[in-house]
């Protein structure tokens, strides 16, 4: 047994060494086959002799048993966000504030990795817990998934108690490989590596996460007590020595001009990196100066994040195609000569509507400027008339639906053309796709191509038919083996237990979004009560305006829809609200039961963070100001909502007043 113990230790050392060379140094000394052979040997030993399996064994990287859910855990120290800078003027103002408070300063510039912020806790040198950022105060425990990332040491080189923070991300080559696999399996593709990383880390089965080949860069440590570091740069060097991966493309600079040079360098070189970045983080380098400057409620005063502007490129507009959405809206899409934008190849981009095409004088054959809105969604910004070829073609929208041939109409007050044929095949298929989507019934495995096959085979004609599908229906479909069929049927069965708001949103009632679906489900609790409501009742509810009220009542009064609901009931699809009622939340009297509207730009938190916090205190956050609104929180550049609130005599708070009230409650 002594020989076996020695071999286990040897395998640990070899596998950890090879893993570090491959994933951290990007310089492997052995082929993958050698690593796999040694890992398989260790797995076999641990299966036959469980006493040799340790918490830091390299076999942990493979993943373990699937979890039922992720636990919510409070951060020992809040994970704060950074203030943003979008241009040189913002950066110079930041520099001026710094120098006014602490005098001369050295900055540390680091690449802002486009991934998911994580916190890693080590006890006696062992990795014991990993959390997502969450809302900054509470994150999700994704320890088992993080253990599969080779760049995260399971055991530090010294037995310290420490919490480090970093950015988990998906390298571009892993992202391309993952999407190729998803395309083969007729699954929805990830839009970008960031979404792919976030989705991978939230897999309940860590074995799936292990296959995604994620990585991580560590950028900070919570407590410097055990560190011989006087600066951010020295702290990163210490983290390297302990076995953590930090980004090497960092630089110390003496002034704001050095910061601007660093930004200029990486703005031009960002595409050469094997991972996505979306900006630059600038920090005061000296740790004592950081302590002197301190924090606001939401961010450190000694750091700021410069965000890259959306990249614009020029390519050729080859054609314009039309798509019909589930509500009949006909949307033009630009077919482009493939071009790389913000790290991915783009061959299609949104043109939104006919008015935009004409207003921007966009013609087929033009050279056009393309960018990704928010570095995600490609859109055509403008044409370049001076480069227009003689044979460029002015585009005119059709008069009839390209799917069903029905005449297209433009409803008063709308810019979009719409097909109003309720039996239009394109709309019906889009409605089915919407019904199974994540925010609706969330039926995993029922992708677009499978739905199209099922519809064309006349196996499903409406959303209720999904719950009547059998193994015999699914097995003959393309790329549907026994395992995929079993998984899909299980997902369909699971969807029957969704809460009422999922069903309401999934039905695709025009104007009824996710939030309004939640409001109605919570208010009426069952579908049967909803079937009896009137427009007059609905318009009295916050967040349910005239259009939504009319649309919901008209939809639910339709006899075909009532028959559809009965068809769903016959298959035991849940029609009851399962969530927590806002009225049951015991919040602070300052907020509980109040209707609050957020307007304008917030600097110390995002609108989403503010909304979540208010909801946690029992407040109802609405999007419009009415006589029933109790408070309006007005950020920078608040517009018509603030004006309306003033005219109605509604109480108005500035962002700072709101933050002060939060601080009072937290103290």
Swiss-Prot record:
Keyword annotations of the record: DNA damage, DNA repair, DNA replication, Ligase, Magnesium, Manganese, Metal-binding, NAD, Zinc
E.C. code: 6.5.1.2
InterPro entries, A to Z: BRCT_dom, BRCT_dom_sf, DisA/LigA_HHH, DNA_ligase, DNA_ligase_AS, DNA_ligase_CS, DNAligase_adenylation, DNAligase_N
Record-annotated active site: 112
SMART domains noted in UniProt: BRCT (SM00292), HhH1 (SM00278), LIGANc (SM00532)
A Pfam family it matches: HHH_2
A molecular function GO annotation: metal ion binding
Domain BRCT as annotated: residue spans: 586-667
Record carries keyword RNA-binding: no
Any GO CC annotation of this UniProt entry: cytosol
Known catalytic reactions: NAD(+) + (deoxyribonucleotide)n-3'-hydroxyl + 5'-phospho-(deoxyribonucleotide)m = (deoxyribonucleotide)n+m + AMP + beta-nicotinamide D-nucleotide
Swiss-Prot/TrEMBL cofactor(s): Mg(2+); Mn(2+)
GO BP field: DNA repair; DNA replication
Top-level taxon of the source organism: Bacteria
CDD domains noted in UniProt: BRCT_DNA_ligase_like (cd17748), LIGANc (cd00114)
Function comment: DNA ligase that catalyzes the formation of phosphodiester linkages between 5'-phosphoryl and 3'-hydroxyl groups in double-stranded DNA using NAD as a coenzyme and as the energy source for the reaction. It is essential for DNA replication and repair of damaged DNA.
Similarity comment text for this entry: Belongs to the NAD-dependent DNA ligase family. LigA subfamily.
Protein name, per record: DNA ligase
Organism from which the protein derives: Staphylococcus aureus (strain COL)
